[in-house]
A protein has these predicted regions:
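Extracytosolic ligand-binding ectodomains
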Residues: 1-278
Length: 278
């Protein structure tokens, strides 16, 4: 957020890969800023779609007490009622948490059908480990911030069987051939692994898409700042990237829909695509 007034004054287009929608809204005040990543609003929409399919009517929220966690909580508050879901309990945790059993116990006592967890860092892994220690049978469904190898390695077997929102590139091999991101994800992952020896995470995909869009904007214009901004806003239509299918406009500088994310299930090897997504 601190960069926004700087790029606005300098009139330089900024592609800002963050979760919150406030970086691009209101668009009239954020005309130089675009969000090329999947946001918390899209992640929550995906969670609520899964809740509908699972028959969950009552959710609890467990979120990190930071901008990322609060963005997830705020989006859930905004969207839950429209999806026919009530929010029966909210609990937060600080970024340096080492024990989340008290919060989990309160959520359990609330009798919720599932717990929506939205956080980053080590405490997110502790949530699942503490849940196993408590023999908590309530499902825990995570936002897309946990869909990375660092979290998966830290949490170990405690997360197996739990649903988590993630980027299609993480499970590209299981995507149906009709999925618009199948081919571009395969190409990106193959090249990335050949160069770096590891599989990319979703953040690498966001950076790749951002760079490609900016480079194309420069090629298609004379490189003048305002023309680059205008090109991004007016010419990015049905742009199939690793992150999703982008459609920027004068009214929308986020440009993605919830189909830029998929629901995954954690397994012993990492993740697998939820059956209904195949």
């Amino acid at each position: 957020m601190a960069a926004i007034p700087i790029v606005t004054e300098a009139e330089v287009a900024l592609l800002c890969p963050v979760s919150g929608v406030s970086v691009v809204e209101p668009v009239a005040e954020r005309k130089w800023v675009f969000r090329p990543g999947q946001g918390g609003d899209l992640s929550v929409a995906k969670v609520l779609d899964y809740a509908r399919r699972a028959g969950w009517k009552k959710l609890g929220i467990l979120y990190s007490a930071d901008a990322y966690g609060e963005d997830g909580r705020n989006n859930m508050r905004k969207l839950a009622a429209g999806a026919g879901v009530s929010l029966d309990r909210e609990e937060s945790f600080p970024a340096n948490s080492t024990d989340l059993k008290p919060q989990l116990a309160k959520l359990k006592s609330a009798g919720v059908d599932a717990i929506f967890m939205h956080g980053l860092g080590a405490p997110s892994a502790i949530v699942y480990k503490n849940a196993r220690e408590l023999e908590l049978a309530t499902p825990i469904i995570s936002g897309h911030g946990q869909a990375n190898s660092a979290f998966r390695n830290a949490v170990g077997d405690a997360v197996i069987g739990q649903p988590i929102v993630g980027a299609p590139v993480l499970v590209w091999g299981e995507l149906p051939n009709s999925h618009p991101q199948k081919k571009v994800s395969e190409s990106f992952v193959t090249k990335y692994q050949a160069k770096f020896g590891i599989a990319p995470d979703m953040f690498a995909g966001v950076a790749y898409d951002s760079a490609n869009m900016v480079l194309q904007a420069i090629r298609e214009t004379n490189g003048e700042r305002a023309q680059i901004r205008d090109w991004l806003e007016n010419k990015i239509k049905n742009y199939v990237g690793v992150t999703g299918v982008f459609n920027f406009s004068a009214q929308d500088h986020a440009g993605l829909k919830s189909d830029a994310l998929v629901m995954m299930i954690a397994d012993k090897d990492g993740w697998r695509l939820a059956d209904y997504e195949k």
